[in-house]
């Protein structure tokens, strides 16, 4: 096994037994690939911007004299990089420039003669860019566009399952859903007539559509029915016989031919009878005349002589009509074949309810239904129907839609056609009728073959197209206005509607969400989320049970575990670990191909549609050495049903055991032992874990922690291999390996780290290096850990020593008892960064001013501000402190006589400004870690702003200079090697100044060329440095583009350190959550015979009823892992020789190992020392989902660590020293601190704002509201008879306006009496009664 440099430092022991055929794919590819498709120039014009432009352009004027053509587009360079956009609060985007060509035709010359062509590049707004981590920065905040799961375009056959009509009759329907355009529905009513609806409007008989397509009644019947031919021979009526049609009928007369009776009258026709008839080749039988009565004619019969209609198509035949026919000389007669079993008379019945007779009347009928109240004209009706389904501008099935449509109706041609045609409509009606006749199945809407994913790129393209269509109308009008001789393309195009559409989508669409940035896992999960809500999707209220439920096609595509609890359950899903989107937007999952009974390593991706036809074995099927199945019968799935199949029938096999579940669920060890409901909570709660001060890797993991940490983008990952040249807290420099160099570059990679930045959830983002100078790294190695990562592995919480036992009721009902040591060691201390901003605006009365000179504020309150009135960095502030002093001009006020007197005596003008400073919110206390000042262009910068500017310039220069020196050093090293090769000696080189090296000349021509090349590069490097610095300087010194009316913005960042305390919520990874009830002194905690106390005591009663046994296994394995770490620590302390250490490590890694095969002998002595050093805190183990460590391995591990195999220890009470009466399960569990902190939730109201109508206090912490004293609480006080308390609650403490003002006055005066009055809600009641027209007045006593 080859380990990367960081992996070697701490190898995670793997208990997995299945071979890893496929690595987990890049986790963010669903976002990045989709957006890449949108942005990249697609020569075919299938996707993205190119497709949008081609679908709207060329735009022709109404009179056809000119047109605007699209040539190409290009995206410019973004003005600011991602970090600058976040600081300045702007959108990270590129300008879109489109090359357009205006062609003017000559009116007088023949059509198509060009008079003039003008080409120009036109600016069409900004396109937001995706960052490399799959997010967008919109107005300075990171957002994610969630992918949407919507109904695929195509045709769907469905039934109402007997719910619509009271009789319980099943009504079938078909619906054609285009990608854009009108829906077309066909449906049966309870009388079995077929109707059509357009866009869910009023229904019309379905034959109307066929009439519009130019079909007559006879042609319609011809399409939908088989015919029966009758012939009159020698005064007898003969019927053409197709024996199969008689199946299941009861004979109403003897069926005979050539004197042989096949079926007697009144008998049922059976299969035997039919075989007999077929064998004897009977084609015609004689039928009584009455038999034809009531049958339906298939076409019109006209009396040739008189020209009158004897019988029309679709008319029932009577004896009279029969006589007329034979009189007119008709010997043959065609009637429709119908029966009650499988050839219903539906279309024939429908034609009878259809009032229209020809194409025009049908068109008019459709026009009336679509545009009620408008007078129909032939032209309007024609064009309306044409534009509904047959015009490419208004209607598009899309490639997916056409593919689904064709596969549904079995059509081979029309691959590219986006509109409908006659064949499509007729085939859909035919299939619907055959389903009604009992042939064929209805579709399953929740099948993932009928639902597709719409990702970022596609949604952005649709929005962009909407903007373009808006522009198109304006362009058409401007083109038609006449004088085009001096008009350029940019005069025609207004970019506003385009950028507005795009901005609206990214800024306020339901699927553009504020990124969940609690920890790396929550970021990754948010980007892999699939929502059924949103525009064009479902709504919470309308979504029923079926849509939300787990479907068999979710297997390996959508996770059955991870979904929110609450109203969105099942509507928001997560992508499974290996799933991906195919070109049509359907989800695919990988399987290993089975060839001739042998499982190969070839992997095929199958969509839900393709999967149906195969037999697929599970990932844990037993295999032989050769790769065949060990068992005769293999558990496998076919069409979603699990069962035992002979091994010869198996076509595919799962690639991995965690293929079924999402990333979050794959991070839960022993998931297979947890109940599904608890696993759901576990998966969801990991996303709420707050990054702790020092991240600690989980002792018991699942082996995919590294994937999540690296793919999430919070770590710094080596782009190329090399050697670490220098490391400090904010930068890592790597000297790149020779073989990975691009010819002619300096060969230095510089990684700038993110320090103490605020995340969207106010947690702290900070990267710290985990490599040392001189260490070799390869491409993809982790160089620096981000939040919640430890040596490149995801680390959401801490490993805590846990005991399962009750402790004095402090762990009743999921409470958690925590040792004080956990607080002292800062195990769960987290840093939260808050951003507070102060905006100075230009008001009507004058500009607001940021200053330290604030009226009526004491010296003490201003002690932390500098002369500009802004708090200094490092100040420790608490609730109510001033951060930024600001004054606002206030209008002239009427002076009181006293003030006039004072004015007259002292002659000073009373201040005409009021204090509107930014103060720290009441519940916050912390340290100021950063201040940023943004000043509008043209407004003079204050001293503090200039200081910050100088500091930034200095830092930028230092960064760039260092970067330049590093690159220069790399370049000169290459020059030196060229000169040495060219005959210079070391001594000679050291005598020449380094800068002069480039001016030397060499005899060897090749080396001289190299030297000249390097000299050129050096000049480029210098020029590049100057250019970069100038750009940086311009960005720092230029004014900021602030919102209208804003002069200055000051942003202050506070860091708040939160220790763990009672009331905080904690959880394990198995859905075992609880609230801390008490923090207990270490000396009172239970301890084992070595005197080691436990950190946390959990209630054992939380396990059995919840059935999450995974946590118990985790605790046992954690104890063993820690025990092995202790043994290694002991060996290091005793300074035992390396050979013994190697032997022990090998023994540990070999235990229960089938696939990892760690070979300690391959590691150098230094590597072994590093490894042993990193394992002292415990041996990290991986137990993959559904392939975890068996009980035997856990016991063996415990024995190896010299611990009891039961995993239970004798504990002693810390308070008395007595042993507890039975052994207790003790071990290590990975605990998380969730982002539900008691500090953010505790709140108490003194006095505050009141609701306008009811005059009652508001509710909620944000409004500084009170606690609601509701109906039930009133009953409680009534039951106690606490009359005075009750009166106080309902009056002065709530909505008695006068009473509460008096109360306030009384308290100030030291008089604690209350005078209750009339509650405002009583007045509201009076008003409501009056609004009903009943006058009600209060009488005074």
UniProtKB/Swiss-Prot annotation:
One of its GO terms (cellular component) is DNA-directed RNA polymerase complex. Its EC number is 2.7.7.6. It catalyses: RNA(n) + a ribonucleoside 5'-triphosphate = RNA(n+1) + diphosphate. InterPro entries: DNA-dir_RNA_pol_bsu_ext_1_sf (IPR042107), DNA-dir_RNA_pol_bsu_external_1 (IPR019462), DNA-dir_RNA_pol_su2 (IPR015712), DNA-dir_RNAP_su2_dom (IPR007120), DNA-dir_RNAP_su2_hyb_sf (IPR037033), RNA_pol_bsu_bac (IPR010243), RNA_pol_bsu_CS (IPR007121), RNA_pol_bsu_protrusion (IPR007644). SUPFAM superfamilies: beta and beta-prime subunits of DNA dependent RNA-polymerase. It is an enzyme of class 2 (transferase). GO terms for molecular function: DNA binding; DNA-directed RNA polymerase activity; ribonucleoside binding. Keywords: DNA-directed RNA polymerase, Nucleotidyltransferase, Transcription, Transferase. PROSITE patterns: RNA_POL_BETA. Pfam families: RNA_pol_Rpb2_1, RNA_pol_Rpb2_2, RNA_pol_Rpb2_3, RNA_pol_Rpb2_45, RNA_pol_Rpb2_6, RNA_pol_Rpb2_7. It comes from the Bacteria. Gene3D superfamilies: 2.40.50.100, 2.40.50.150, 3.90.1100.10, DNA-directed RNA polymerase, beta subunit, external 1 domain, DNA-directed RNA polymerase, subunit 2, domain 6, RNA polymerase alpha subunit dimerisation domain. GO terms for biological process: DNA-templated transcription. DNA-dependent RNA polymerase catalyzes the transcription of DNA into RNA using the four ribonucleoside triphosphates as substrates. The RNAP catalytic core consists of 2 alpha, 1 beta, 1 beta' and 1 omega subunit. When a sigma factor is associated with the core the holoenzyme is formed, which can initiate transcription. Belongs to the RNA polymerase beta chain family. This is DNA-directed RNA polymerase subunit beta. It comes from Vibrio cholerae serotype O1 (strain ATCC 39541 / Classical Ogawa 395 / O395).
